[in-house]
């Protein structure tokens, strides 16, 4: 359900999955994903901004709502409101509901980086179905368990129209981060001096980084570029992210190893973005 989708939050993943169900091509929506590594490092490591508050890339649902493509409204309602709206997932509307942290951890086995977690609510025959993004799974719940899991709010989503050529051109012209302007960036060991909780911050940065580079590859593919060279680095990006998570959990890592990991990311990213710049004529 969520394979090949690169949202930066559970809600964005759900929106992307809904759009794909509606046969909307989602890759053009990743237009502003080529955030330079130095900006990711500054905001997520130096400043310590949590991924949930990272706003250098605007959320896709906000872009689409502003363009009149998507109706997206948060509602604080009784569970009965969402039960009445639920369908089998084939229609032009969707309901996301907030679930409790206990349900998120114990039933969904999800480990998010924020306290609130949203899932899609579906009705299939007489069953209530919860659709989760990460891990990608569905859970069938009796009503009494759903009542315990529900945490009091949700989002109403409706596709108003499909993105058209004007939207695609608008997204291209609205890019803040243009790979054709890429300049190489390297780290210095003293960049980490005085940074608290380096392991957690570096884990957050690498998690956002890999998602954004996947999005970048998907976006520029829609503009006729061969971005296989980025996709081929997917396994390496996942390995670096796993290593950053290991360093975070171990909590006894010397600064030199964090610096080594940063340089590994920089070497890879400079090569990727330089090639993308060349393909774009920069």
Can you annotate each of these PLM segments?
Residues 4, 8, 53, 176-177, ...:
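Intrinsic-disorder-associated interaction segments
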Residues 15, 60, 64, 82-83, ...:
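Generic structural signal of hydrophobic/aromatic residues within well-ordered alpha-helices
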Residues 20-28, 41-49, 174-180, 198-205, ...:
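Phosphate-binding glycine-rich loops and adjacent basic patches that engage nucleotide phosphates
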Residues 110, 126-222:
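Noncatalytic regulatory segments and standalone regulatory/sensor domains
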Residues 217-282:
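Charged, long alpha-helical assembly modules
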């Amino acid at each position: 359900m969520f394979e090949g989708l690169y949202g930066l939050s559970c809600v964005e993943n759900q929106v992307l999955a809904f759009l794909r169900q509606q046969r909307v091509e989602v890759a053009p929506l990743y237009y502003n994903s080529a955030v330079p590594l130095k900006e990711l490092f500054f905001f997520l490591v130096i400043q310590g901004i949590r991924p949930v508050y990272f706003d250098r890339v605007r959320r896709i649902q906000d872009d689409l709502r502003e363009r009149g493509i998507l109706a997206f409204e948060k509602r604080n309602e009784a569970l009965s409101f969402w039960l009445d709206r639920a369908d089998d997932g084939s229609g032009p509307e969707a309901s996301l509901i907030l679930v409790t942290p206990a349900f998120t951890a114990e039933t969904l086995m999800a480990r998010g980086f924020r306290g609130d977690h949203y899932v899609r609510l579906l009705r299939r025959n007489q069953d209530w179905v919860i659709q989760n993004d990460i891990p990608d799974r569905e859970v069938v719940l009796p009503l009494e368990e759903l009542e315990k899991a529900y945490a009091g709010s949700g989002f109403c989503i409706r596709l108003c129209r499909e993105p058209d050529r004007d939207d695609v051109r608008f997204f291209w012209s609205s890019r803040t981060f243009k790979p054709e302007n890429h300049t190489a960036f390297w780290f210095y060991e003293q960049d980490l001096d005085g940074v608290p909780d380096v392991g957690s911050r570096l884990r957050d940065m690498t998690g956002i980084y890999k998602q954004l580079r996947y999005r970048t590859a998907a976006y520029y593919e829609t503009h006729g570029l061969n971005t296989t060279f980025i996709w081929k680095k997917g396994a390496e990006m996942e390995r670096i992210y796993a290593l950053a998570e290991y360093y975070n959990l171990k909590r006894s890592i010397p600064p030199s190893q964090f610096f080594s990991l940063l340089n590994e990311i920089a070497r890879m990213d400079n090569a990727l973005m330089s090639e993308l710049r060349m393909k774009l004529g920069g």
